[in-house]
Every structure is written in structure tokens, then in C-alpha cells.
Amino acid sequence: MTKYSAVLFSGGLDSAVLLAEALAAAGGERAAAPLPLYVSAGFAWEDEEQAMAARLFSRPPFAGAVGRLVSLRFDVRDVLPETHWAVRGTPPAFDTPDEDVYLEGRNIILLSKAALYTAAAFPTRSAAARIALLFGTLAGNPFPDATPQFFTTMARTLSLGLARDFVVETPFVMMRKSEVIRRGMELGVPFELTLSCMQPARGRHCGRCSKCRERRDAFREAGMEDPAPYRETPVR
């Protein structure tokens, strides 16, 4: 069976390790390399993420092994109010629970847009061709659009609606973020060029949002120092 693959890429450490893992699995064959896709929804941090991704792709293990980052648009600012924290760039604070950053329908948007793009980019309709959408969800994700049932059902829906054979793969679904970090170290991922922040500025993490706290805790659990720059050091 011919298998095409695309990685849903955000510029964060999870998707960076996921892409590095997929490149390693491709064995250096450019034709087998996954297609990195970034879906822009109109959120405040997206320009920073894409700028950092360009720097990341200039470094091993990505340089020369993967093509440019494909940037797609699926703007939701006509759905969310102008005062929404993701639009204004005023994210939940450091100690708030993960549930506070939930963006309804986020994974539906990402997978739908990725499927539409890959259906056109990989035009074969052969029954022996499969398109894999690689998604970096982790263990313990509390949201309804991050369950195994959701991903299986979504793949079935995309396959039916686009007359392709889609599968959504979640290789890290049983892993904690600290385990992903350790795997990334083995693969040589330059974590200083990954961005896991909802209020970044000039390539630096804010150190104040809950995503910065999550990243700090994961590096501590992994027994490693986070090499990324911060505007404020998350000390709590």
C-alpha cells in the first residue's frame, strides 16, 4: 500500500518531536518524508509560531529533510467574539487548569483543513493509497475532540466525504509531555526553537501563561533544563 503522510505542526515541542519521529521513520528518503502543515485560525500567537518554525526548519534534524512549512487558513474570528482570549492574546494565567485553554472544535478544524489539502496534494484515488494525518495529542488530554473515538470517527468521516482512505495517527497518545521531551532529545530536536506559549513576543515565551507552566513542569519532570528563552522566568 502507498502511504502518504502529513504532520499537524504548531511549532510547539510536541509537534516538533512528532515531525522528527516521522522523518526518522522515513529513513532519510525525501519522497517518504511527511508534509508539515500549519493551520492558522486567526489566533494572537500564530505569527510568532510560524516565524519560529522557519528557524526550526533550518536546523537538524529538519534542515534538508523536510520541505517548507505549508501554511493553511481556517479563520474562526467570525465565530469567536473579539474579546475572546485567543483572539486578543490574553490567555489564562500561570496556575489555571488545562480546561481553561479549551478551544471548541479546534481539532475538527485542524483535521478538516489538513484532509482537504492532502486530498488535493496527493491526488491518487487508488484503493491502495492511504493518507495518514499525524497528530500530537498526549496522554491525559481532557478534551472531547482528543479521544480515540473522536479520531477514529473523524478519519472515517473524512474518508467517506473525500473518497480517500484517511487514518488519523496519534503516536504520543500514551505518553506524557516529559516522555516526549526525552524522545526529542534522542532525536536531536532543538527545543530552544520550539514555542509553547500563548503570549509570545520576538521568539520568547512569556513565562506567565498556563502553557508556559505546562512546559516548565514537563522539563522538570524530564530532569532537563528548558533551553528556550523566557521574558519572565517561571519560578513557581
Residue ranges and their predicted role:
Residues 1-188:
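ATP-dependent adenylation/nucleotidyltransferase module used to activate substrates
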Residues 201-204, 210-235:
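Iron-sulfur (Fe-S) cluster-binding segments and ferredoxin-like electron-carrier domains
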Residues 186-206:
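Immediate flanking context of iron-sulfur cluster ligation sites
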Residues 1, 235-236:
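C-terminal end-of-chain micro-motif
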